[in-house]
From Swiss-Prot:
The gene is nrdR. Residues 48-138 form the ATP-cone domain. Its cofactor is Zn(2+). Keywords: ATP-binding, DNA-binding, Metal-binding, Nucleotide-binding, Repressor, Transcription, Transcription regulation, Zinc, Zinc-finger. Belongs to the NrdR family. Negatively regulates transcription of bacterial ribonucleotide reductase nrd genes and operons by binding to NrdR-boxes. A zinc finger (unnamed) spans 3-34. Pfam families: ATP-cone (PF03477), Zn_ribbon_NrdR (PF22811). It comes from the Bacteria. This is Transcriptional repressor NrdR. Binds 1 zinc ion. One of its GO terms (biological process) is negative regulation of DNA-templated transcription. One of its GO terms (molecular function) is ATP binding.
Amino acid sequence: MRCPFCQFEGLKVTDSRDAMEMNAIRRRRECLNCLKRFTTFETIELTVQVQKRDGTYEDFQQHKLINGLAAACRHTKISHDQVISLAAQMTNELMQSQIQQISTTQLGEMAMKHLQSLDPIAYIRFACVYKRFKDLGELEEAIKTIQSKDEDKSCSILKDLL
């Protein structure tokens, strides 16, 4: 690696720590020639291929996942940091599964599973785009599904209290 300021190849790592929200290692480096400091990020290259709806494939891109989740979570109780953390968690799940390919359908289902436990509004917003509801009936069905799961949680909490 070369210094971005003077192009000298002699560098020293002065600090190294995990940047968990980015699935990376953050390193502070110092040039041994000009003594300027800069930061680098070391990331794992995830080589999962995503099969799109039209049948084509592209490399998994975490920023696309973040953008989709952020759009669904806009104006909800979920912060941008939580969106980044959720995307990192999903990326970790992909890496641990050691799969080579995943469809956008599978990614969408994975995102919906996580969103459902975080915020029902974000879940419905994501579902509207991901499932491409054709009419209000399909939207109503999705809302009923999430309401019944919330009621099941409430009932189990009440049973535990009694």
